[in-house]
A protein has these predicted regions:
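Conserved C-terminal "switch" segment of AAA+ ATPases
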Residues: 1-56, 140-146, 173-183
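Conserved RecA-like P-loop NTPase ATPase core
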Residues: 3, 29, 40, 57, ...
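Short hydrophobic/aromatic residue motifs in ordered secondary structure
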Residues: 32, 89-90
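DNA-binding alpha-helical recognition surfaces that contact promoter or target DNA
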Residues: 35, 59, 243
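C-terminal accessory region of SF2 helicases/translocases
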Residues: 66, 70-71
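Substrate-recognition/cap regions that form aromatic- and gly/pro-loop-enriched pockets
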Residues: 74
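Soluble catalytic regions of large protease machineries
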Residues: 78-85, 91-249
Length: 249
């Protein structure tokens, strides 16, 4: 509602959807929204557009909300294809598990470094199922590269680290890991319990990785179509993902 009210007088092209902006800015504030739209207007003028187009807003979102600036640095073609599959995999698993949840996905890296990102709406896991869905989505990048190229994704270390942290939270809140095995003397977990927890966590991570792989295998056409879209356009918004998925049905 805030976004709709703020944009009511903006000269927007027909391809601009309010829902795209809302989903791409999960923590929207009036100040940030104003900065995004001011930059989008400048982009529009610079590009010679009659109205503010979706591409103008997308570029502004990348620069303002995600601090991703354009770079002249070229990425190796084969490496870019793997990056595109990695980010597409995050988006595909997110959309399959929770349709409409992915707001923006891009292969543009930060500070000229190869990479990309996929970001969803401002959602908070309400239960264990939703929490494990988030972990599954986090592991999807590595699974996607393995599925399509049959190699280990060396760019996935940050994802694995994030998934590991999420599983620590899962054990504490959902798996009872925070309630047993405490040594009374210094209020710390026993070595036996730590080893037990690590074994549970590793097994669960493996299970969720295989789950992500299976989802991608079953939606391979969608995955490859999103990869193609990223290679062609660099960045996709929620409506783009919806159109791609519809075309794959």
């Amino acid at each position: 509602n805030i976004v709709s009210y703020y944009l009511r007088d903006k000269d927007l092209a027909e391809d601009v959807l309010i829902s795209d902006i809302v989903k791409a800015m999960p923590k929207v504030s009036c100040a940030t929204l104003e900065t995004v739209m001011n930059l989008a207007a400048l982009n529009s003028v610079y590009q010679g557009h009659e109205h503010i187009q979706k591409e103008d807003i997308t570029e502004a979102l990348l620069q303002v909300e995600y601090k991703l600036q354009k770079t002249d640095k070229e990425t190796d073609s084969s490496e870019l294809q793997k990056i595109a599959v990695h980010e597409a995999a995050h988006a595909v698993v997110g959309e399959v598990l929770h349709p409409g949840s992915i707001g923006i996905v891009t292969v543009r890296g930060s500070q000229g470094v190869i990479g990309g990102m996929a970001n969803g709406c401002a959602t908070y896991a309400q239960n264990e199922e939703e929490f494990l869905d988030e972990v599954t989505k986090t592991l999807a990048g590595r699974a996607g590269v393995s599925l399509i190229y049959g190699v280990m994704d060396i760019q996935a270390s940050a994802d694995i680290e994030q998934a590991d942290k999420l599983m620590d939270i899962w054990q504490c809140h959902f798996a009872g890991g925070g309630f047993v095995g405490i040594e009374s003397g210094d209020n710390r977990m026993s070595e036996q319990r730590l080893s037990y927890n690590e074994a549970i966590k590793s097994a669960k991570l493996e299970e969720l990785y295989r789950r992500a792989y299976k989802i991608l295998h079953n939606n391979k056409e969608f995955l490859l179509a999103v990869q193609h879209g990223l290679l062609e356009h660099e960045t996709l918004l929620n409506s783009d993902l919806a159109k791609i998925r519809e075309s794959c049905i």
